[in-house]
C-alpha cells in the first residue's frame, strides 16, 4: 500500500506513473512480468527497468544505464551491481556478500568483456523490450526466468553489458531458512534450464561454436553443476575417505597449494572481509551439499523442481526487539488463571528431521569420525581441517547461523 500511495503522490505532480497488481500467482515472477508487458502503455516504451521490491536505485540510475542501449542497438541488457545494506547484520550476510561480490566483480565482468554474455540477475537491470520479444518473451518453465530469458536472447545474437560502477542497494536474507530456499532455487533452476535448453543451444545457427561452448561448458556445466560437485566430493568426501584407505594418496599441492590460491583469488572480491575467508570457505563447502541436491533435482526434473518460495527479507523488523505491554501481560495471565476450561490449541510437535538438516548433520558426524581416526591411527595430519569442517556441517545442520537460530 505504501507503493500505491507513493505512486499517487507522483501522479499528482504530473508524472506518468501507474500502480498495477494482479490477483493470482500464476507463473510466479515470470507470469507477473509477462502480464505486465501486455499493458497498453508498455507499447509506447523501448526499455524496461526491473527492480525487486527490496532494491533502492539512485535517482540517476536511468541516466547512467539507458545511454548504453540508446547508442548501441546490438545491446539487449544493461546489468548493474548489487550493494547490500545489511551485510554487517550477521555472519550469514557477510558470507553472502563475499560470494556475491566475487560473482559480480569477476564472473559478470568477465562474461561481459569476453563474450558479451552473462546471466541476468533478475533485478537492477534495464532491458530492450524488442530483444525480449525477439527471444520469445518471459517463460515460466523453470524457476530462473531471468536466466532463461538471458540465454534465449543471447542465442538470437544480442549482446549484454555489465556496468559495475552503478550500484543498487538491496537486502540480503538474514535467516538461514530463507537463504536455504533461495539457494535451492538458484541451484535447481539453472540445472533444470540446462536440461531443457541443451538441444536448443546445440542446434542454434545464430551464435558461434565458441559461444556455444561457453554457454554449455563454462556457464552451465562448470558454473552451475560441476563447481558444487567437485567442491563437495573433494573437500568433504575424498579427503576424509583417504584417512581410512592408505592407498588413496592426495599430493600436498592438491590439499594445500591449489585450494589456497583459488580461495585467495575469490577473497579479492571482498577485501574488507578477508579475515573471514577461512570460515567462508568452510561454509561454502557445507552449502555445496545442498546445492548438489538441488542441481540433481533440476536435472531429473523431479521433486521440488518448480518450487517457488519468496525469499524472506526482514528489513527493519530484524532490528526491533519484541515487547509486551505490562497491562497486556497481566490480562493474559488473568485469562490463563480464571478460565482453565478453555481448550488450548495443541501445537504439533516438530519432528527432528523437519526441524534440522539431517544430511548436513550426518556428513558432519562422518567427517569428525574420520578426523578422530586420522588423529589416533592414520597420522596423515588432516584431523585439524576435518574437525573444523565437521563442526561447520553441524553448525549449519542445527541452523545455528543467521539472525534467528533455533
Task: Enumerate the predicted regions with their spans.
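Active-site donor/metal-binding and catalytic loop motifs
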Residues: 164-178, 306
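Long helical/loop segments within the catalytic core of UDP-sugar-dependent glycosyltransferases
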Residues: 7-47, 59-143, 148, 154-155, ...
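Membrane-embedded multi-pass helical conduit in multi-pass membrane proteins
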Residues: 221-314, 360-406
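Loop-to-transmembrane boundary segments
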Residues: 204-230, 315-376
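Cytosol-/stroma-facing membrane-proximal "stalk/adaptor" domains immediately downstream
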Residues: 3, 22-23, 29-30, 34-40, ...
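Catalytic beta-strand/loop signature of glycosyltransferases that borders the donor
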Residues: 81, 157, 161-169
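Conserved beta-strand termini and adjacent loop/short-helix elements that scaffold enzyme active sites
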Residues: 20-22, 163-165, 311
Amino acid at each position: 500500500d505504501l507503493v500505491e500511495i507513493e505512486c499517487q503522490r507522483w501522479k499528482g505532480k504530473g508524472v506518468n506513473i501507474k500502480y498495477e497488481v494482479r490477483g493470482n500467482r500464476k507463473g510466479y515472477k515470470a507470469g507477473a512480468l509477462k502480464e505486465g508487458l501486455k499493458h497498453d502503455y508498455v507499447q509506447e516504451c523501448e526499455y524496461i527497468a526491473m527492480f525487486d521490491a527490496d532494491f533502492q536505485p539512485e535517482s540517476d540510475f536511468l541516466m547512467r544505464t539507458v545511454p548504453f542501449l540508446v547508442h548501441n542497438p546490438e545491446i539487449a541488457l544493461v546489468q548493474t551491481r548489487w550493494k547490500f545494506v545489511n551485510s554487517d547484520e550477521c555472519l550469514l550476510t557477510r558470507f553472502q556478500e563475499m560470494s556475491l561480490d566475487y560473482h559480480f566483480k569477476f564472473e559478470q565482468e568477465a562474461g561481459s568483456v569476453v563474450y558479451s554474455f552473462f546471466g541476468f540477475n533478475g533485478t537492477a537491470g534495464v532491458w530492450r523490450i524488442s530483444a525480449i520479444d525477439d527471444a520469445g518473451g518471459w517463460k515460466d518453465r523453470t524457476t530462473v526466468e531471468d536466466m532463461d530469458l538471458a540465454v534465449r536472447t543471447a542465442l538470437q545474437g544480442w549482446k549484454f553489458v555489465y556496468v559495475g560502477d552503478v550500484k543498487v542497494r538491496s537486502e540480503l536474507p538474514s535467516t538461514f531458512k530463507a537463504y536455504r530456499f533461495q539457494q535451492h532455487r538458484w541451484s535447481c533452476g539453472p540445472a533444470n534450464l540446462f536440461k531443457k535448453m541443451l538441444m536448443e543451444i546445440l542446434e542454434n545457427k545464430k551464435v558461434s561454436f565458441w559461444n556455444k561452448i561457453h554457454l554449455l561448458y563454462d556457464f552451465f556445466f562448470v558454473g552451475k553443476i560441476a563447481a558444487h560437485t567437485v567442491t563437495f566430493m573433494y573437500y568433504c568426501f575424498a579427503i576424509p575417505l583417504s584417512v581410512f584407505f592408505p592407498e588413496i594418496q592426495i599430493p600436498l599441492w592438491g590439499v594445500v597449494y591449489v585450494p589456497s590460491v583459488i580461495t585467495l583469488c575469490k577473497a579479492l572480491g571482498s577485501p574488507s572481509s578477508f579475515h573471514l575467508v577461512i570460515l567462508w570457505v568452510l561454509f561454502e563447502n557445507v552449502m555445496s551439499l545442498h546445492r548438489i541436491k538441488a542441481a540433481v533435482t533440476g536435472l531429473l526434473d523431479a521433486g521440488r523442481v518448480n518450487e517457488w518460495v519468496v525469499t524472506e527479507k526482514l528489513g527493519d523488523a530484524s532490528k526491533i526487539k519484541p515487547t509486551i505491554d505490562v497491562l497486556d501481560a497481566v490480562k493474559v495471565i488473568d485469562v490463563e488463571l480464571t478460565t482453565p476450561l478453555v481448550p488450548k490449541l495443541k501445537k504439533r510437535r516438530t519432528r527432528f528431521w523437519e526441524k534440522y538438516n539431517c544430511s548436513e548433520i550426518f556428513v558432519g558426524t562422518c567427517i569428525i569420525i574420520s578426523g578422530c581416526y586420522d588423529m589416533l591411527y592414520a597420522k596423515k595430519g588432516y584431523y585439524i581441517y576435518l574437525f573444523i569442517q565437521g563442526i561447520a556441517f553441524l553448525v549449519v545442520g542445527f541452523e545455528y547461523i543467521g539472525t534467528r537460530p533455533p
